Structure formats: structure tokens, C-alpha cells
Amino acid sequence: MVYKISVIAVCIAALAIVLMVKAYTGPDEPPMALDEHTYATITPLEFDKCCAMWLILRFVDAHAVFKVYPQGTYLAGPRVFDVGGATWSRQHRKCTSDCIWDDLNVNDGAAERIVLMAHQIELNRWHLDQFPQAQQADNELRQIIEQNPDPNDCIKLTMEYFDTLYAQLRTVSRGAQNRSVMGA
């Protein structure tokens, strides 16, 4: 009896190991190939993911095209973002936008403030009331996402949203610089 139980336990352990290895290494089919300017991610769309798209389009690849696949789709490769295992994905105390921004090494105060908003929204969701500008931006973007279920339409509108937000933040930054130069 003890022998049978031992054999069953060993078989169950072996099966568990096989399943864990399978889950860790991904499915049998290879990841889908992406065209040169195509970047891929999975649903759902949210502030950090849309901010990451905007950063890619404005600072990495002006010809970027985004493909959004259903959650659970196996994606891998150099132009995959905000999915497990991707270089540009949430890691410890960094959101996806933080990871992209760190790689860019760009000095742009307005863009950096947008990335900071993404960070606050992604990592401080339960304390967002402490960051009113980020909270407002999150609410505005959520409204765009909810009203536009088609990912392509939604991406177009969110890129316009981030361009507008960027222009507003640049104007505020320039105004502050002008006041400091004038001694105000």
C-alpha cells in the first residue's frame, strides 16, 4: 500500500513539474513574427500601456504600428511590450512606461511628467487621490477607452490625447521657465 501511494505521489510530482516547465517555456507554437515597425501587446488597454505606445511612437519609432492581441496570446520578441518576459514591461517598482523612458535617455520635462503620471497610476492606484493631475488624466483616458472598444480607434484617440497633454505640459513648462528667467 505504501509503495502504491509513493508511486502515485511521484507520478503527480512529475506531472506537476512537466506542467510547470511547459507553462514557463510557453506554448509549442512559435511567437508570431512582427513586421519591422509593428509593436505588439495584449488587452486590456490602460493608461500605462497607452503611454508606452505614445512613447514608442514619439521617441522610438515614428512609423510604429500597434497590434493588440487578446489576453493570453503568447507574444515574444524585441517589439513586444507590457507582457510578461518583455524588456519593456512592469518590473518591481517600475511601470512599462518607466522602463521605456529609462532606455530612451531623453531630457524632456513634459514627457517625463507624463511618464511620472503613468507610474503614479500604475503603482499607486489605491492612493491616486494624492496625485490629482494623474487621477484626472487616468479618468480622461479611461473614458476614451470605454467609449472606443475597437483597439485601432482607441489607440488613435489615445495618441491624440497624449499629444494634447504633452503640448499642455510643454506650455506650462515654458511658462515656468520664462518666469524664472525674468526673475518672477
Walk through the language-model features, giving the residues of each.
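N-terminal, charge-rich interaction modules
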Residues: 36-57
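Conserved non-transmembrane functional hotspots
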Residues: 33-36, 53, 61, 71-92
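Feature marks short, highly hydrophobic, charge-poor N-terminal signal-anchor/signal peptide-like helices
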Residues: 1-7
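Ser/Thr/Pro/Gly-rich low-complexity linker/stalk segments immediately outside membranes or between
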Residues: 24-36
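A short, structured beta-strand/loop element
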Residues: 67-69
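Hydrophobic membrane-insertion alpha-helices, especially the h-region
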Residues: 8-20
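A recognition module on extended beta-rich or small alphabeta surfaces enriched in W/G with H and D/E
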Residues: 78-115
